[in-house]
Amino acid sequence: MTLQAAAIIVAAGSSARMGFDKICASLAGRTVLEWSLQAFQDCADVSEIVLVCAAERLTEFQNLAAAFSKVRNVTPGGAQRSASVLNGLTILSANPPALVAVHDAARPLISASLVSRVLHAAKTHQAASAAQPVTDSLHRGEADGVLSETVSRQNLFAMQTPQAASFDLLWNALRAHPDVTDEVSALIASGIHPQAVVHNEPNFKITYPLDLQLAEILRNADYNNSAI
């Protein structure tokens, strides 16, 4: 069954760790943002997209998003992530969809099939997120970097995006818990337990210059199309 979900693409970050604008950085012939938008444009379960960006770049991003027919609105972001997502939800509130997916624009390797999997899991479980099991050994350290405790990685997942939930659940969770790093944190704090959608696709966030180089290699190899 095809869903009629909405997506909020968050592109309002500062790119401080990159040292340059990662959202509009060139990646395999397109920008990072365009690759993220394309996955949601191609997903049959997504009927509309709201793009959230820095206020001073509104016109630039409106022009870039014009090539994507599902982008219905480009709106300014807030001072923190939750405020940016709430701005997107406010746009959608005039005619709220049953489900909303939130995605970091800086994850340009996302595939339409993974978006669909997360949305269908959210429909079944109220909320869901793309996730991968933690595979590295984990140790807790002190302020000076001295390692003091081993942390079991059993049942630990690294959260990614998209993260999806019903409109009302997400709206209420973010309003009640604005100081969070992602939507899953707000939902859990509100007593909702999202489903982890475990996958093996490359879906890392562009954080450092090396990430962009790796994404370029994978995009040129057409990794997602061969993996789905």
What is each of the regions a protein language model found here?
Residues L27, H139-E142, I206-T207:
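Short beta-strand-to-turn element immediately C-terminal to the catalytic PLP-Schiff-base lysine
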Residues I9, L33, G88, H103-D104, ...:
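Residue-level signal for inorganic ion chemistry
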Residues Q195-P202:
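Catalytic beta-strand/loop signature of glycosyltransferases that borders the donor
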Residues N203-I228:
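Hydrophobic helical membrane-anchoring modules
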Residues E34-P97:
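Conserved N-terminal catalytic core of the sugar/cofactor nucleotidyltransferase
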Residues L99-A101:
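Short aromatic/hydrophobic "clamp" motif used to bind/position activated sugar donors
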